[in-house]
Amino acid sequence: MITEFFERLFLSNKGSREDVKRRLKLVLAHDRSTLNASTLEKMREEILLVVSKYVELDTDSLEFSIRTDSKMTALIANLPIRRILKDI
């Protein structure tokens, strides 16, 4: 079982090679879950949008993974926080 599907899903000016790797990982995650790749990508974007309203994230260290066992599939997000933003 692959323990980490997504490594640094954010693009950080590393070019199209990193983009291709990110998309491939989404496809692999799709193959192992009932969610399609575009839904997974949209979930990732929306999660980050909401969390970013409250904290500044270390975008170079973000990790998303999907773990599946016989009973469930879990989306796991590792979102390192640089600092907490002031009240909105």
From Swiss-Prot:
Keywords: Cell cycle, Cell division, Chloroplast, Plastid
Cell cycle in keyword set: yes
Keyword Heme: no
Cellular localization per UniProt: Plastid, Chloroplast
SUPFAM superfamilies: Cell division protein MinE topological specificity domain (SSF55229)
Main location: plastid
GO cellular component: chloroplast
One Pfam family from the record: MinE
Biological process terms in GO annotation: cell division; regulation of division septum assembly
InterPro entries registered for this protein in UniProt: MinE, MinE_sf
HAMAP family: MinE
Matching NCBIfam families: minE (TIGR01215)
Function recorded in the entry: Prevents the cell division inhibition by proteins minC and minD at internal division sites while permitting inhibition at polar sites.
Family membership: Belongs to the MinE family.
Official protein name in the record: Putative cell division topological specificity factor
Organism lineage: Eukaryota, Cryptophyceae, Pyrenomonadales, Geminigeraceae, Guillardia
Gene (name only): minE
